Amino acid sequence: MTFELRAAFAPCGDQPEAIAKLTQGIRNDVQSQVLLGTTGSGKTFTIANVVANVNRPTLVLAHNKTLAAQLYQEFKEFFPNNAVEYFISYYDYYQPEAYIARNDTYIEKSLLINSEIDKLRLSATRSILERRDTLIVSSVSCIYGIGSPENYASMALELKVGKEYPRTLLAAQLVKMNYQASPVAQRSTFRERGSVIDIFPAYESDQAIRLEFFNDTLSSIEYSDPLTMIPTASVASTIIYPGSHYVTPEAVREQAICSIREELEERMLFFHDRPVEQDRLFHRTTHDIEMIKETGFCKGIENYSRHFTKMPPGAPPACLLDYFPEDFLLVIDESHQTLPQIRAMYRGDLSRKQSLVEYGFRLPSAYDNRPLTYEEAQKYFHNVIYVSATPGETELNESQGHIVEQIIRPTGIPDPIPEIRPATGQVDDLLEEIRKRLSKSQEKILVISITKKLAEDIAAFLSELDIAAAYLHSGIETAERTRILADLRLGNIDVLIGVNLLREGLDLPEVSLVAILDADKEGFLRSTSSLIQFCGRAARNVEGKVIFYADQKTRSIEQTLKETERRRQIQLDYNKANNITPKPIIKAIFANPIPQGGKKESQEPAKTPLSIKELEKLIKKFENLMQEAAHEFRFDEAAKYRDKMKAAKEQLLYLS
């Protein structure tokens, strides 16, 4: 299949030229290009057009889950008939294994896996192996090891009508693929009923596979509704993919066990004069080997990944990037933040594992269960488009002059010129500006502070004045961060104060004021790049305004003013030449995801959007009702609850 772009609008402004240049660059095998696009200029739409033009498997890399979720939703709308997939960390909670030598404290790995995201990850790898019209939106999880595509593909099970498959052997093979025999219809399971085997793929929630046999001959394959098992399609063949990225063929597993034992013997000699470490490593590793022999799996199996892939020590791990063909297109969104993040991943992982290996908790091969280094990741940059309003030196150097500007916004809204006010008395002045905007409906304010403490103090000060305010910084747990961002989008918060709000992807049309406190304190978050990015947060609103609270004009402020004026003039000239009046983006933040039906519901007043906690409760409620209805053979009713649960999960995924 080819990529089929669906949009209710055509490219305009700078977009047609940007699309043409980027497309031609890829066709001419230009390795690196930069799309320098202002906030609100439609960069995602431009990339979607390029993807449709070049028709290659595509990986879009975002620097956090929030941005990845936004991009995933947008690309799904642009390519409804293609495989748009989502690949991020599937941990709702993750405490990595660690050892603190100074106080002899071992911290065992603790985690909570999000089943829905696990399904999406498996769906992503299935799609990229099966079809070229695949676009995967990913966080930096794509550079972490997940098991080799060769092992994963070799464990896939191809079934054809008319061929013989002894059912006992088929069931055993499904177990090896990480499927469980269960009477309950849920993903990663299968069930046998007479001459029928129903399989519920690990990467699907809307489709089951029903196999019917005559003796051991496969007589039919039907795709079915997983609740009602009513057939939706009949096919001559199908492929069932494993329920985990870490499954391996038996021969590979046996070879890996031998290799692990050899490394263990070497390490026993290393610890000959350290009996505590020697005993600890021997018992831990021996237990893991026995688990792998018996079940094909053990806790922390990823630490032995090198033995399964037969790679030499220090070799890069197999990751999502290895699942793509060589001619894939890589799009790095917000590259000025994403590239530094890729650089940082390896160093953080290495420092944690050093003490685990040194004190006998892990074999040295655990070092190879890691993210790629930046240099290793670069080897996959065959055709890459860096996307940013403020690209860094790395991207500019790599692109060797292949820089495509996209300054003009389809909305006609020019960049707001930052107003500079004294830093002395900045909080009182800010309060007055906030009150002006809160007298208007639906307007939001972003405040950028210089420290976490100041963000907390301002939020407390505003809250005492009955202003709906909250602070956001790195000290807040992920779950709470998610809730705060959701409340901002849902309208429960009017003012958000933070130190680095750029990382949150807050491009809201409702933001009419961005205030940067202590803007003259030169540093990472007061650099030219950061200041321009902050200004862009107000460029989606016709009334958008930016205030720099500064007692002096720093070099970064001067460069920001110069670049902002340049971009503003380009937009104004375009508006004048094309008789365009700036207009705001009309976009609903969130709608109630639960389908409404029936006379009674239609007469109820419109419900306010649901919070994350409310959605989680609702999902659990619908899941229980669905299972209860299915157990009582009320399949039509169960299907309705299934659809409601799916809609709620999609909304929760977007909020998260």
Swiss-Prot record:
SMART domains: DEXDc, HELICc
Every UVR domain range: 616-651
Keyword field: ATP-binding, Cytoplasm, DNA damage, DNA excision, DNA repair, Excision nuclease, Nucleotide-binding, SOS response
Keyword Transferase: no
Gene Ontology annotations of biological process type: nucleotide-excision repair; SOS response
Residues binding ATP, per UniProt: G37, T38, T39, G40, S41, G42, K43, T44
GO cellular component: cytoplasm; excinuclease repair complex
Localization, UniProt: Cytoplasm
Classification via Pfam families: Helicase_C (PF00271), ResIII (PF04851), UVR (PF02151), UvrB (PF12344), UvrB_inter (PF17757)
Single GO MF descriptor: ATP hydrolysis activity
Main localization, broad class: cytoplasm
InterPro entries per the UniProt record, alphabetical: Helicase/UvrB_N (IPR006935), Helicase_ATP-bd (IPR014001), Helicase_C-like (IPR001650), P-loop_NTPase (IPR027417), UVR_dom (IPR001943), UVR_dom_sf (IPR036876), UvrB (IPR004807), UvrB_inter (IPR041471)
Domain of life (superkingdom): Bacteria
Entry annotated with the keyword Nucleotide-binding: yes
Residue pairs linked by disulfide bridges in the UniProt entry: none
Motif (Beta-hairpin): 90-113
Ranges for domain Helicase C-terminal: 426-589
Cross-referenced SUPFAM superfamilies: C-terminal UvrC-binding domain of UvrB, P-loop containing nucleoside triphosphate hydrolases
Free-text note regarding domains: The beta-hairpin motif is involved in DNA binding.
Chain's role: The UvrABC repair system catalyzes the recognition and processing of DNA lesions. A damage recognition complex composed of 2 UvrA and 2 UvrB subunits scans DNA for abnormalities. Upon binding of the UvrA(2)B(2) complex to a putative damaged site, the DNA wraps around one UvrB monomer. DNA wrap is dependent on ATP binding by UvrB and probably causes local melting of the DNA helix, facilitating insertion of UvrB beta-hairpin between the DNA strands. Then UvrB probes one DNA strand for the presence of a lesion.
UniProt-listed HAMAP family: UvrB
Subunit structure: Forms a heterotetramer with UvrA during the search for lesions. Interacts with UvrC in an incision complex.
Similarity comment: family membership: Belongs to the UvrB family.
NCBIfam families recorded: PRK05298.1, uvrb
Official protein name in the record: UvrABC system protein B
Organism for this UniProt entry: Chlamydia caviae (strain ATCC VR-813 / DSM 19441 / 03DC25 / GPIC) (Chlamydophila caviae)
